[in-house]
Amino acid sequence: MCDMGFWAIVEKKTGKMIGRIGIEPKMWNGRNSVVELGYLIDSDYRRQGYALEACRAVLEEAEKRGARHLYCRIHSANLPSVNLARKLGFEKIDYHLEEEGNDINVYRYICNQ
């Protein structure tokens, strides 16, 4: 486990907050807590590389803080996030349905690869 945190994603040229990103503990499948990566980018700023840059910075920070693995859960229909996870080096390890019926893919990133 590592120290957790949340950060603002800020557009460099304007200083405007355009999203957020963080790592936090989660309980999955009754297992011990794992570290989950989550992010949200304002719709006007998506598909411009902000999430990739922010995720790379947070992965590096998580490794510095002692994380061994990071996980993310992504709706299978959210192809931009699926592609981002793959580009970052996450691998799909599980699949489940939420109570609401949403299908979720679970991805894992192994730190210090």
Please give the residue ranges for each predicted region:
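Acyl-donor (CoA/ACP) binding surface of acyl/acetyltransferases
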Residues: 4-113
